[in-house]
UniProtKB/Swiss-Prot annotation:
Function: Promotes LRP6 phosphorylation by casein kinases and thereby plays a role in Wnt signaling. May be a membrane scaffold protein involved in the self-aggregation of LRP6 to further enhance its activity.
Record region (Disordered): 260-302, 316-360
Topology of the protein relative to the lipid bilayer: Multi-pass membrane protein
Gene Ontology BP annotations: positive regulation of canonical Wnt signaling pathway; Wnt signaling pathway
Name this protein carries in UniProt: Transmembrane protein 198
Organism, as annotated: Mus musculus (Mouse)
Gene name tied to this protein: Tmem198
Lineage, opening ranks: Eukaryota, Metazoa, Chordata, Craniata, Vertebrata
Family according to the record: Belongs to the TMEM198 family.
């Protein structure tokens, strides 16, 4: 474990200060000799920290990819740089190249498999909170062995990982805010104290005795929770108010379930059709099929019937016709053979009398 922790101080870190520097860091002025590669890495960490801290949940896929890339790269670099690979001791550049390639694969897996990405995000949150607890308890507690910090890191990481799988939205927001604030504080620590606070964290994880921190280090350490709180508030009130990646996943799952049900229903219908016995062909000549009714859309309308005045009988004519049939008004019919009291212009009977002609 001490050898693994020593690999954290590779080429990005400046030379380790001596005991006199640890003894009086506030009185002795710092020699700020910046290098190009560490400065570039710290600037990129600051930019990614801003994205993590204030836009973490909105950039959900990007956060999962970067978290997987970070875990894969760090773990593989420590293994390759510390251990012998194929009986060959790899250099720092070769180890960094291998770690970057495997880290890209881990990032893709974390981005595509949502549960893996959430587990890594929660694990990172637990590790950072455990490291913050070690830093905060520095004036009051000194671990006797390395197993105390190691158990705290593993326990906190697994607990936060499981809680993130249970409540993804609030804990992802908290994890991204804390991670982004830690990246910004690390970049500020490099430009202010040449990663003196980072070395202090490593020594605390190794359970090594270290002197108390200077006020500059405590100010940089106080920047971490302050930025974390700001990031949580900004994401809760602004950037994550209308976004919910959980609802998107649930809607996709419902759509898949509906498609599966439709396919199952179609398969059942096909099985029922196959189970039905085929109908026997009818004996004898088959009659030609009857033509079906024409389509109502193409049916011709009937020709409208024209009406004239003589087509409608007057009520007086109908009454006189009834009287003639019963024989009750024979004299009146002979006196006035035509009915002039008409309404629609009928001037004569439309039909002849059914009885024999009467002679007068």
């Amino acid at each position: 474990m001490p050898g693994t922790m020593e690999t954290l101080r590779f080429q990005l870190l400046p030379p380790e200060p001596d005991d006199t520097f640890w003894g009086a860091p506030c009185e002795q002025p710092l020699e700020r000799r910046y290098q190009a590669l560490p400065a570039l890495v710290c600037i990129m960490c600051c930019l990614f920290g801003v994205v993590y801290c204030f836009f973490g949940y909105r950039c959900f896929k990007a956060v999962l990819f970067l978290t997987g890339l970070l875990f894969g790269s760090v773990v593989i670099f420590l293994l390759c740089y510390r251990e012998r690979v194929l009986e060959t001791q790899l250099s720092a550049g070769a180890s960094a190249g291998i770690a970057l390639g495997i880290g890209l694969l881990c990032g893709l897996v974390a981005m595509l498999v949502r549960s893996v990405g959430l587990f890594l995000v929660g694990l990172l949150l637990g590790l950072l909170l455990a490291a913050a607890a070690l830093l905060g308890s520095a004036p009051y507690y000194q671990p006797g062995s390395v197993w105390g910090p190691l158990g705290l890191l593993l326990g906190g990481g697994l607990l936060c990982a499981l809680l993130t799988l249970r409540w993804p939205r609030p804990l992802t927001t908290l994890a991204t805010a804390v991670t982004g604030a830690a990246l910004i504080a690390t970049a500020a620590d490099y430009f202010a104290e040449l990663l003196l606070l980072g070395r202090y964290v490593v020594e605390r994880l190794r359970a090594a005795p270290v002197p108390p921190l200077c006020w500059r280090s405590w100010a940089l350490l106080a920047l971490w929770p302050l930025l974390s709180l700001m990031g949580v508030l900004v994401q809760w009130r602004v950037t994550t108010e209308r976004d919910s990646h959980t609802e998107v996943v649930i809607s996709r799952q419902r759509r898949r379930v509906q498609l599966m049900r439709i396919r199952q229903q179609e398969e059942r219908k096909e099985k029922r059709r196959k189970k039905r016995p085929p109908r026997a062909p009818p004996r004898g000549p088959r009659a030609p099929p009857r033509p079906g009714p024409p389509d109502p859309a193409y049916r011709r309308r009937p020709v409208p019937i024209k009406r004239f005045n003589g087509d409608v009988l007057s009520p007086s004519y109908i009454q006189s016709f009834r009287d003639r049939q019963t024989g009750s008004s024979l004299s009146s019919f002979m006196a006035s053979p035509t009915d002039t009291d008409y309404e629609y212009g009928s001037r004569g009977p439309l039909t002849a009398c059914s009885g024999p002609p009467v002679r007068v």
